[in-house]
Amino acid sequence: MGSDWDEIKRLAADFQKAQLTSTLQKLSERNCVEIVTLLLEKQLLEVVFTNDGKEYITPDHLEREIQDELYANGGRANLVEVSRTLNVDLSRIVALAERIAAENPLVHLVLGQLIDEDYISHIAQEINEKLALRGEISISDLASQFDLPSEFLQQDVVEKHLGKIIKGRQDATNPRVFFTQAYIQRCKAKIRGALAAITRPTNVAVILQQINVQEKIFHSLLDEISPAGQVTSKLANAQYVPHIYAKTQADWVNSFYKQNSFLEYDAINKLGISDAKSYIRKQFPNEEFLFLKRVALGARLVELTVVTALNECSATKQYLDLTTILPSNLSEEDIEEVFSAIMAQKHSNPSNFVYLDSIVFSQPYLTELVQPCHALAEAQAKAAIDSGVYQQFIVEKTLAQKGNASFQDQDDDGKLDKRDERRKKASSGKAGGGAQGRETKTKSTKKHQRRSAAAQNDSDVEDDVQHQGSRGAGGGGGNKKTVKPLDLVKTADIEKLINASLQEEGLEHLAPSIAALYLNQLNQAALAKAQELYEATPQTNRRQTHAAIQDRINTLLIDIRLYEKGLKLFSHDTQTQLVKYLLKSLGNDICNELSLYVASECNLTVKNTSLNVDQRIKLAQECDAEYRSALLEQNKALNKSIDDFELATESVLKACSMIIKKVDKKKDRLLIADHKNKLQQQLLDCQEPALLLHLAALILFTTISGCILHASGKFVSAILQHIRGSLSDPQNDMLLRYHDLVLQVLQTAPESDDSKMAHEQLQIMQSKVVELAQNYTRASVSKAD
C-alpha cells in the first residue's frame, strides 16, 4: 500500500510538472502581425494604435496607463500632455477620460484635465492656508491662481470642504467671497477704533484708506458695530457724521434760534449741513417757519412782532420802518420778501399798506399826505382849459381816430389795386421787360401827414398812446396814427407839495417814489376835471376845434401844392395817374375832415368817421343849405384837376368861416428838406426790398429835381425812368438790376430756388442802393460825367 501511494504521488508530480511545463514556440514578427490582423478583421480583438502606427495597445490597458499618468501627476493631468506622453491620438485619450470620469465619481474632467479627489483635497488645504493668512479670499482670485473654472472651485472645492478642510464662512451678501471669523473680528476692531476717534464729518473713502478695510465689509459690519454716529449713504461720496458733531450742530442751531427767532441758511451751511431748509424742518418739527430766500423766520417773530406792528400801523394811520423790528442782518431784499409773504397770508389785506424801501405806509397816511395834490390837479385842469391845451388834445385824438379808419380803407383799396394789376399781367402774359414797362409792387403805406403831436385827452385817456406825426413819403409807412397822453400833473409838482411833510419824518428820499405812485391817479383826476370844464364850455371848445381843423386843412393844401410841382415833371399820362392818386389820398382826407366838421356844426350824428363818396354826399344833403352845395361840389372835384379841387375846397372853407393862409414860398425849401430827411430815416430802418427801392426812388427824385412826390409803389418804374438821365450808367444799371430782382421775388413762389437766390442778391445790393440814395447830390452828376 505504501508503494502504491508513493507511485500515485510520483504520477501526480509528473502530471503537475506536465501541466506547469509550457511549450513555447517563437513566432516571427510577420506571423504576429498576421495573427493580430486576422483577429481585428474578425472583431475578436480591439486595439489602439500609437500615433506612429508601430505599436498598439488595448483600450483597457490604455485606460490603466491614463490612470497611472493621473497618479504620477499628483491627481491633475492635462489630457494634451497625456496624449503626448503615451503617443496616442488625443481623441482616444479624451474618450477614455470621459469614461473614467463617468465611471469613477472621485475623478472629474474639467476643461481638458482629469482631477481626482486627492488633488481637490490638496488645493482645499492650500486655500485654507491662504484664507488663514489673508483672512478673506474670493473665488475670482482662486480661479486666477489655480487656473480652474470659478464654478468648479466654488461648488466642488470650497463649498464642499467649507467647515471641514477650509476653516471659514461664506459672505451672505456675496457668495463668491469667503473669510475667517478672526478676519471679521479684526475688521470690526479697526472700524470701531477708527469711528471712535473721529470727531467731525469724514469721507468714508478716507476712513477705509486708513484702516485698509473694503467698503462692502465696512457697510455690512457697520450695523453690528452700532457706532456713535451715522453714515449719510452707501454711495461713493458718503460721509460718516459722529453723534458728537451732530449734537454740536444741533446745540448751535437751537441756541441761535432761541436768541434770534430766525436762522440764516449760509450760517447753517457753514456747519457742514448742505440742505438747510430740510435740516430746520427736521430739527424743529413742531415749529412753524417762514422760509425766505436767505433766512427762515420763526412764527413767533412774524406773528408777535411784524404782524402786530403792521396792525398797529394800520390802526394808527401811520407808517412802520421794518428795519427797526426785524434783525439787523436782514437785507432790504429779505425785508421786502418778509412783507410780501405776510401780505400773501389769508388774514392780511395788502390794499391797506404800501411798501417803499423797507418802509410800510398805511393807506390813510398816504391819502392824507397827497391830499393837497388834488387841489393842484384841479388847478392844472382849469389852466389846460384856459390855455386851450386840452381842447387841442381832444382835436388831435379825434383826427387820429379818423386817420386810422381812413388808413384801413386805403389799405383795402391798395389790395384791390394789386389784384387788378395781377389780373392785367395774367391776361397780357408779360412779366416785364425794359425800363418803360416795369411796375414795382410795395406794401400799402401811410398817407402823407405833417403836424406836431399835441397834448390831448378826454374821459377815455387811458386808451391813448404815443403819436408820431411825420411827413411820410407817398405810401412810405404803414403805422397807424396815435396820440401822446396828456400829463396835466407833473412828478416834480407832487414832490414839491409832499416833501415838507416827509422831511419832518426824515423820509424825504421817498418823495419821488410816492409821487410816481400817485401820478397816474392825480392825472386821471385832473383830466376828469378838465373834461367836466370842457363840456361846460361848448362855445370855447367849438372855437378851438374850428382853429385846429383850419390849420390841418391849410397844412394839407400846402402839401398838395408841393406835390403838384413834382408830378408836373412827368409825362401827361403818368401825370394824370399821379393827380388821381394824390386826390384819392390827401384830397379824400380834406373832404372827410370838412364833412365831419360841418356835421358837428349841424348837430348830425356820424357813427363812422371814415367816409366814402356816397356817405359824404348823403351827409351833405342832410346838412344846412349854406354848406350843402359847397360840399357836393367838393366831392365832385375829387375826379377833376387839382385846381378844381382847390377852388371847391376854398368854397367849403368860406362856408365854414375858415381862411386859407397865404403861400409862403420861403418855407417850401425847409419843408422839402424836412420831407427828404424823414424819407432817409425810413430808408435806414427799412429791410423789405420793394419798399426800400420805393423810398430810394423818391429820395433820388427829390435830390435831383428839388421837388417832393406823392406816389405809390406802382410808379417806381416811371420815377426810375425820369431820373435815369441824371445818374451814371453803373448807377442806373444797379437800380435796374435791383428793380428786376424785386419783380422776380414778387412773381415767384416764396420757397422756390429762384426766389431764394433773388433774395440773396437783394441783400448783397441793399447797402449799395441805400448808400446811393443817402449820399447822392446834384454835384455828383457832373463828377460822374
From Swiss-Prot:
GO terms for molecular function: UFM1 ligase activity. InterPro entries: Ufl1, Ufl1-like_C, Ufl1_dom, Ufl1_N. Keywords: Transferase, Ubl conjugation pathway. GO terms for biological process: protein K69-linked ufmylation; regulation of proteasomal ubiquitin-dependent protein catabolic process; response to endoplasmic reticulum stress. Its EC number is 2.3.2.-. Transmembrane segments: none annotated. E3 UFM1-protein ligase that mediates ufmylation of target proteins. This is E3 UFM1-protein ligase 1 homolog.
